[in-house]
């Protein structure tokens, strides 16, 4: 049986939490995001956004059903909120991104921007009936009737919460990229060349 907590000294470096104030930190439930690229919803409400003073208040906020992740109501405090996810608390909207120090941050965004999300294509498979299934970085699988020219590494802009593909962003020379690793983590750059 897996553990529901881990020690703060061993938590991922991307989490913007103090390590020596408490011993334990809630672990996110398994999801499509990697452990390093998401944080539990309860910790986000309590420690990052400061909406709740303790986990008991965070649970009450969640059970009042005013918190949404990617346009869907969430009541699980261990649900992982990962990179590019849209978090809505009441009338406030936030997007999870990486800052220049490699820490997960929740930046306020406009209501119009909260209706869409950018997802990276991690793979494609052909399923029964000749349909194409696209696998995205946050664990989503989108089934498409036609076979589009989506390649691994490209990004899709999907509308929330209905998950319809609204546009396709190719990874090619001259495109804009958001860096999620390396020494320039959290920066936006132009692709000069591709190997």
What residue spans do the PLM features occupy?
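Ferredoxin-like alpha/beta domains used as RNA- or RNAP-binding modules
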Residues: 1-195
């Amino acid at each position: 049986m897996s553990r529901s907590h881990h020690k703060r000294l061993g938590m991922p470096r991307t989490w913007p939490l103090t390590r020596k104030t408490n011993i334990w930190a809630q672990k996110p439930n398994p999801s499509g995001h990697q452990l390093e690229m998401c944080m539990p919803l309860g910790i986000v409400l309590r420690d990052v956004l400061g909406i709740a003073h303790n986990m008991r208040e965070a649970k009450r906020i969640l059970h009042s059903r005013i918190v949404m992740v990617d346009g869907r109501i969430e009541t699980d405090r261990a649900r992982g909120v990962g990179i590019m996810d849209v978090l809505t608390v009441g009338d406030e909207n936030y997007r999870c991104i990486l800052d220049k120090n490699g820490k997960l941050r929740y930046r306020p965004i406009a209501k119009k921007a909260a209706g869409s999300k950018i997802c990276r294509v991690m793979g494609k498979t052909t399923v029964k009936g000749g349909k194409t299934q696209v696998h995205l970085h946050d664990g989503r699988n989108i089934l498409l009737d036609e076979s589009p020219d989506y390649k691994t590494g490209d990004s899709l802009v999907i509308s929330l919460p209905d998950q319809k593909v609204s546009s396709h962003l190719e990874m090619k020379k001259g495109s804009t990229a958001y860096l999620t690793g390396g020494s320039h983590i959290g920066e936006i750059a132009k692709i000069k060349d591709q190997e």
